[in-house]
């Protein structure tokens, strides 16, 4: 054991010398192998094996170094290498023995250490108390996980690239090389698409094409009747350039050609001139004074122009010219009529207008760049700038004091006219609004109204609206008061705690009318009004709408809901609105809270009174018996198990209330009727009627399964002799069908179940022998047989031995008529021939069978 460290020290010293003999490539290879061995030894945790592996590696590399030293050619290096090799072999032999002894001693320790380490790892993983990983461990785990995911992603990317490469190889292998013949055929087909042989044949003259001649040019017979060139020249003018041609209206051309309008008037219509605007039109202020002409120059130019005569001047001479110019600057809306201002103010306004015209010239040059709507807007803007409304502020309206007797008024009636102590002294008090008179305009004394200048003769204008302007648009401009409160002076009256008891308003009044004084009337200014200005539909006199009270509403409801007309028909509730309640908005009056005074009862006097004075009413007790179900025949369960409920009979007042309610009840209301269920017997009868189908029912004509070409079903022959003794029907009715009608087979049905409109008996109706004979007698003519005289009148009856009595009548001999020639094909008898009843029945039977 003592020689072990010595051997290790010698080994380390020799390794430094040995490294000098290695080349750089061999040293790198040696380091890589040594690192790999050390990692393998660390995983196995076997110290002995790792040391042995390192010694083996050194022994393996020493001969390599020795061989490389031989190649150098130096003799000294060879001797040193041999000496080192001999020393190493001796040390290795001694070391192997020591290592063998060491391994023998420590052979079981490694296995024990491995087992304990595995047990500790298992306990750490499965133990309940585990140590939480630190931040460094968590970071390391995340890095390892990220590296693992990145490696997996790279692996998947490599696999994907490999698959793509494999597919490329497959596609490259699938490419088929075409032969040269196929390529030439494809080129030939492509060349055929652009072949120009046909064009060359046409150009060379091999193919002759048909020549289409041009349309013949006919000689002009005369002017074109639809030519409007002359009208265009007349309207547009000959000086216009061809590039600026415009479309000419066909109507204007017709007027010019027919002579209705002259050329000058047509040119004026085609090029209308804009009318000169009056008033201030300077929208650009003083910046465009030099660019525009003055209005005076434009007026002078228009006055110097000579008027052109046309056909319409003759009509203008007959009409009287109005000397009053038309003022277009006046707005058309309703405006207030101004009072006539003094002459001095008018002169000042005219002077100001002239100065404004000089400063703001007319901009008529720029009319071509504007529209008519812009011109109207400009006029309104200029008018709003120049027009100044005179507004007079009325601080207080002076009203005449009304003199009324004060004896009839109480002291509290003037409380609303008293001044309040908390009112601000500087702010004037707003007067109450004046009461509007019943008719006429609303005029307040002391107020100045703003209006425009009145026309000179308003009576001559049939469209004068001065009266309407006075009535509609009279405004009084008062001083602004933002803090005005119209109800500030009113005293807040607290509502009474006890509501007044309801009383009948129609029974009479309990108030003393002598103490009632009418309210003071506000003084108004009376205006004399002519009878022509009276408006029959004027509602200005109505100051407030009086709503109907509860009594009036009840009368109206009674008239509308319970109104009985001439026929005695009572109006009911509307079926379209069943939930209508006319008293839904009416609040129920609160019952007055009255304090009841408890009086001490005198028992002595109460005992002395008779029972008649106590007004004792007898009460009748009844019992509520459940009504029996009349339709439920099979639900009789015996007597009712529920005990009877006693109740008191209603009084007369309640009966009257119920009668009133019954008047308003809908007669067709079925909401109170309980749901009636069918009994078992009724259900059985209905099932029997639905399931059992009678045999004599036939298919409907609309039956999809009906086959008109199907062979008829064989009908058994009728037994005409099987007839009952009691015959109650016609003679020609078949007996078998009659049995079905009378139900002689004993089906159990009564005669009441017979359908009087049943036509099933006429299904197979055929005429009898008697009917056929009657038809033959009607269709065939009768042949009269000649009756010859059997007895001779002249001969004696006794002689002949006939034995006739004396009084036996004898037929007289008639002269024989000649035989008539009867035509067997004569149809004159069949002119008015109509089918008989039997034929109609046959036709019906045939149609029904089909």
Curated annotation (Swiss-Prot):
Compositional bias segments (type: Acidic residues): 451-462
Region: Interaction with Syt, residue numbers: 26-290
Compositionally biased tracts (Polar residues): 78-91
Stretches assigned to coiled coil: none
Locus of motif DPF 2: 461-463
Biased amino acid composition, Pro residues: 431-440
Keywords attached to this entry: Cytoplasm, Cytoplasmic vesicle, Endocytosis, Repeat, Synapse
Sequence motif DPF 4, residues: 666-668
Motif (DPF 1): 224-226
Record motif DPF 5, residues: 755-757
Basic and acidic residues: bias regions: 28-38, 136-164, 574-588, 596-607
Protein role: Adapter protein involved in endocytic recycling of synaptic vesicles membranes. May act by mediating the retrieval of synaptotagmin protein Syt from the plasma membrane, thereby facilitating the internalization of multiple synaptic vesicles from the plasma membrane.
Subunit relationships: Interacts with the second C2 domain of Syt.
Domain writeup: The Asp-Pro-Phe (DPF) motifs, which are found in many presynatic proteins, are thought to mediate an interaction with AP-2alpha.
Additional record remark: StnB, which is involved in the same pathway, is derived from the same bicistronic transcript that encodes these two different proteins.
Protein name: Protein stoned-A
Organism: Drosophila melanogaster
């Amino acid at each position: 054991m003592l020689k072990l460290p010595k051997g290790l020290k010698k080994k380390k010293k020799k390794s430094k010398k040995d490294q000098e003999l290695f080349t750089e490539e061999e040293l790198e290879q040696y380091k890589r192998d040594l690192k790999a061995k050390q990692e393998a030894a660390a995983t196995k945790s076997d110290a002995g094996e790792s040391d042995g592996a390192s010694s083996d590696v050194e022994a393996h590399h020493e001969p390599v170094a020795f061989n490389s030293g031989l190649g150098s050619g130096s003799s000294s290096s060879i001797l040193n290498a041999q000496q080192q090799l001999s020393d190493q072999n001796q040390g290795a032999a001694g070391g192997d023995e020591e290592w063998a002894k060491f391994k023998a001693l420590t052979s079981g320790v490694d296995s024990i250490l491995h087992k304990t380490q595995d047990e500790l790892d298992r306990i750490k993983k499965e133990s309940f108390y585990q140590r939480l990983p630190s931040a460094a461990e968590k970071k390391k785990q995340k890095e390892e996980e990220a590296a693992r995911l990145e490696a997996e992603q790279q692996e998947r990317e490599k696999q994907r690239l490999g698959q793509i490469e494999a597919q490329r190889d497959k596609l490259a292998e699938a490419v088929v090389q075409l032969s040269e013949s196929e390529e030439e055929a494809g080129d030939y087909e492509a060349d055929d698409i652009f072949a120009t042989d046909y064009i060359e044949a046409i150009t060379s003259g091999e193919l002759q094409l048909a020549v289409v001649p041009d349309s013949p040019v006919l000689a002009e017979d005369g002017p074109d009747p639809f030519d409007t060139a002359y009208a265009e020249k007349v309207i547009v003018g000959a000086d216009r350039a061809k590039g600026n041609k415009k479309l000419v209206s066909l109507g204007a051309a017709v007027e010019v050609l027919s002579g209705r309008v002259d050329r000058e008037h047509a040119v004026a219509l085609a090029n209308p001139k804009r009318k000169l605007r009056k008033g201030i039109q300077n929208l650009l202020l003083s910046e465009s004074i030099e660019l525009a002409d003055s209005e005076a120059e434009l007026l002078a130019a228009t006055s110097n122009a000579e008027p052109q005569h046309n056909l319409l001047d003759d009509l203008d001479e007959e009409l009287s010219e109005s000397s009053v110019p038309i003022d277009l600057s006046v707005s058309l809306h309703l405006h207030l009529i101004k009072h006539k201002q003094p002459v001095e103010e008018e002169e000042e306004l005219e002077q100001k207008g002239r100065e404004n015209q000089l400063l703001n010239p007319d901009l008529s040059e720029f009319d071509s760049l504007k529209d008519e709507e812009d011109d109207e807007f400009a006029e309104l803007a200029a008018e709003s700038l120049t027009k100044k409304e005179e507004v007079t502020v009325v601080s207080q309206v002076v009203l005449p004091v009304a003199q009324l007797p004060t004896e009839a008024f109480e002291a509290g009636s003037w409380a609303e006219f008293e001044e309040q102590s908390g009112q601000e002294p500087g702010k004037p008090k707003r007067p109450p609004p004046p009461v509007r008179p019943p008719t006429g305009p609303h005029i307040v004394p002391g107020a100045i109204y703003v209006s425009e200048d009145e026309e000179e003769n308003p009576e001559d204008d049939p469209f004068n609206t001065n009266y309407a302007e006075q009535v509609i648009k009279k405004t009084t401009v008062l001083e602004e008061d933002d803090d005005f409160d119209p109800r500030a002076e009113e005293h807040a009256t607290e509502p009474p705690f006890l509501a007044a008891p309801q009383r009948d308003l129609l029974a009479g009044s309990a108030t003393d009318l002598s103490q009632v004084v009418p309210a003071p009337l506000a003084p108004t200014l009376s205006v004399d009004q002519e009878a022509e200005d009276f408006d029959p539909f004027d509602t200005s006199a109505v100051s407030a709408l009086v709503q109907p009270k509860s009594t009036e509403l009840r009368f109206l409801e009674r008239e509308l809901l319970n109104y009985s007309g001439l026929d005695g028909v009572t109006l009911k509730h509307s079926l379209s609105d069943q939930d209508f309640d006319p008293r839904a908005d009416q609040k129920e009056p609160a019952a007055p809270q009255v304090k009841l005074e408890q009086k001490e009862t005198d028992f002595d006097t109460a005992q002395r009174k008779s029972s008649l004075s106590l007004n004792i009413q007898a009460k009748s007790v009844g019992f509520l018996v459940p009504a029996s179900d009349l339709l439920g025949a099979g639900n009789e369960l015996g007597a009712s198990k529920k005990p009877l409920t006693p109740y008191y009979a209603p009084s007369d007042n309640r009966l009257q209330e119920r009668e009133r309610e019954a008047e308003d009840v809908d007669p067709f209301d079925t909401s109170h009727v309980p749901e009636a269920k069918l009994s078992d017997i009724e259900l059985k009868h209905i099932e029997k009627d639905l399931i059992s189908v009678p045999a004599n029912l036939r298919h409907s004509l609309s039956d999809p399964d009906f086959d008109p070409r199907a062979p008829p079903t064989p009908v058994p022959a009728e037994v005409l002799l099987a007839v009952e003794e009691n015959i109650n029907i016609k003679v020609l009715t078949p007996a078998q069908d009659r049995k079905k009608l009378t139900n002689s087979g004993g089906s159990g049905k009564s005669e009441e179940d017979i359908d009087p409109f049943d036509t099933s008996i006429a299904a197979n109706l055929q005429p009898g022998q008697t009917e056929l004979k009657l038809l033959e007698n009607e269709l065939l003519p009768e042949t009269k047989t000649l009756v010859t005289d059997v007895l001779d009148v002249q001969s004696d009856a006794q002689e002949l031995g006939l034995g006739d009595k004396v009084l036996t009548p004898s037929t007289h001999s008639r002269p024989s008529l000649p035989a008539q020639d009867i035509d067997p094909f004569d149809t004159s008898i069949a002119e008015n021939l109509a089918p008989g009843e039997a034929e109609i029945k046959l036709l019906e039977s045939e149609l029904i069978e089909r």
